[in-house]
Amino acid sequence: MAVEDLKPSQGTVKTGLRENAVGLPGMLMQGIATIAPSFAILASFVFIVSWAGLSTPWAYLFGGALLCLQALNAAQLAKVFPSAGGWYTWIARAFHPRAGFFAGVLFSVWLPPVGALTLSYLAYTVLEPSIKAEYGVDVKWWIWVIAGLALVIFFAYQGIALSEKALIITGSIEIVIMVALAITGLVSAGPGGFSWAPLNPGNFHLASNLFLGVVFSIFAFSGWESTGPMAEESKNPKRNVPIGLVGSVIILMVYFVFVTWGYLVGIGVSKAGTIPTATAWPVATFAQHVWSGAWVFLLFALLNSAIAVSIACFNGGTRTWYAMGRSGVLPTALGKVNPKRKTPDNSIHLEVGMQVVAFACVLIWGVSDVFITWANAITIGLVLMYILANIGVVKYYLTEGRAQFSPLLHVVVPVIASAAGVVVVWKSYFSPFTSSGPVFWGLLVFIAIVVVTILALIYMRIRGQEEWMAKAQLVFEQSGTSH
């Protein structure tokens, strides 16, 4: 069937996954856990303070607001095109299948290696040195990685219901601990005492470059996108997936603003300028000061965060591969499910293999370099994926979805979100341009991803293997409606 022959009424498919297994709390936690609340603070707080200073909570607020616009755009597609393919299907259906293929490739590079890379980065930079310094016990970082991955893989094979319950538990624990630490900071303020200064917009002029603080805060929110591939296992996906997309960003925006305010006050508003040059992670130093021996709960929160994000990315990555295998653009074996557990076992097998590859890369090239290179490559790719989805929103609602067309939602918001994405990439990678280090290598990896994607599309075109283009647009049809 040619793509042009696919009528909207024909574009549905039944699922082999377990329908109605995940409620709204699970959908929200899928996005929240992939953002990784405590790990995101580890990866972004010090860097953003170096640009935004006391106005760091505002940087997270503005960055979150911009991503709310993008999440709102994605929700416009999710509510009409529910599918385990997520962005792959949305873009294929609303814009073009070849554009959707890029989203599928990006998800294949983004979500599958998260477990090995996140656990490696956390264990190498925090867990091993902290446990050794605090207790004199030398637990090698790679032991944490292997143990963590074993747990994540176990949950993946057990089925979506159990893994989502584990996700809710681990994700909730980390948020409670991080918020408790922030409250402690507000109650037991550091030098400068309790202060509203971090929330005062009158202090914007004190930031060295608040704009760059906003730009880099956007990186902390990446992960909400993984809610999309859970559609076929969600209750009422046309409602819950859009809420999960937008809701996870809003919840984390409030979280980031509150906890960074608490940490700045706890560390000391008069010492905020020393945060970027601290030899140890300032949040950990602060936790040791106010919680004494109980500061180990911070390590527990970080470990929970790494486990939760790994589970969430396992789920999102395998479901995307399942949909791509079902459409035939990837080996059809990936579209098969276990008849008992309703899990895409072959996709899970492949995901386990990706952990091995990612871990091997870490051992060869080093934890920090591999993690930062990968993170930068994915960031550029996500912005391009956003823009493709935004084009799809405009195209769909000006044509097939004309009856629901809204100039604000379907033109203004997509244009603003796309423009913001372009500015983020420009300021992050080209102004100024760097020709060395992980940022540069991340740019090269992104270019390689695009080249491989184009070559694959050309190859399939030459070979006449284009049946997948129609199947890529198939939208999930529920066997029954669950509210």
Predicted regions and their residues:
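Select transmembrane alpha-helical segments in multipass membrane proteins
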Residues: 21-31, 57, 65, 96-110, ...
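Helix-loop-helix junctions that connect adjacent transmembrane segments
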Residues: 13-18, 57, 133-140, 168-296, ...
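TM-loop-TM module centered on a large, flexible mid-protein loop between adjacent transmembrane helices
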Residues: 89-90, 96, 128-133, 244-314, ...
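Hydrophobic transmembrane alpha-helices that form the core helical bundles
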Residues: 43-50, 58-59, 68-149, 154-157, ...
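Membrane-interface "cap" regions at the ends of multi-pass membrane proteins
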Residues: 1-55, 61, 68, 72, ...
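Transmembrane helix-loop boundary segments of multi-pass membrane transporters
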Residues: 46-57, 129-141, 160-171, 297, ...
